[in-house]
Amino acid sequence: MSRVPDNLYYTKSHEWFLIENGVATVGITDYAQHQLTDIVYVDFPKNGEHKNKGETLLTIESVKSAEDVYSPVTGEIIEINRDLESKPELINEDPYKNWLVKIRLSNDNFDGMSGEEYKKYIGE
C-alpha cells in the first residue's frame, strides 16, 4: 500500500502539494513513484518561471518511462529541490520529504483531494 499523509492535498495526476504562507510545495505521491519505478532524471523548470494550474510543470524520467508532472496551482516557481538534480532516486526513497518545486501562489484557485479521498481514488 502507498503512503498517503493526511496533511497534504492530492491531484488525480498523482501530485501532492502543501500550502504554507502563500507558497505551494509540490511533489509526486508514493503511488506515482511506485508506478514509475527507478527514477533516473528530473527535467526541472527555471526559477522565476510562471506556471498555470494544470500546465506541465516538469518531466520525471525513470527506467520505465518519462512522465509529465502537472502544476496543481498557478504561480511563480521560487525554489527547485537541487538535491534531486544529482540524486533523483531520492524521490523513490521518500517522495514526501523529497519535494520537487516551491511555487508562490498568484491566486487562491487550487483544489485537491484529501488523503482519504486520494486513497479511495487509487483504490487503497
UniProtKB/Swiss-Prot annotation:
Function: The glycine cleavage system catalyzes the degradation of glycine. The H protein shuttles the methylamine group of glycine from the P protein to the T protein.
Name of the featured protein: Probable glycine cleavage system H protein
PROSITE patterns recorded: BIOTINYL_LIPOYL
PANTHER family, sorted: GLYCINE CLEAVAGE SYSTEM H PROTEIN, GLYCINE CLEAVAGE SYSTEM H PROTEIN-RELATED
Cofactor note: Binds 1 lipoyl cofactor covalently.
Domain Lipoyl-binding: 23-104
Top-level taxonomy: Archaea, Methanobacteriati, Thermoplasmatota, Thermoplasmata, Thermoplasmatales
Family: Belongs to the GcvH family.
Alphabetical list of InterPro entries matching this protein: Biotin_lipoyl (IPR000089), GCV_H (IPR002930), GCV_H/Fam206 (IPR033753), GCV_H_sub (IPR017453), Single_hybrid_motif (IPR011053)
GO biological process: glycine decarboxylation via glycine cleavage system
Keyword set, alphabetical order: Lipoyl
Organism field: Picrophilus torridus (strain ATCC 700027 / DSM 9790 / JCM 10055 / NBRC 100828 / KAW 2/3)
Keyword Ribonucleoprotein: no
Residues carrying N6-lipoyllysine: K64
Subunit architecture: The glycine cleavage system is composed of four proteins: P, T, L and H.
GO annotation, cellular component aspect: cytosol; glycine cleavage complex
Cofactor field: (R)-lipoate
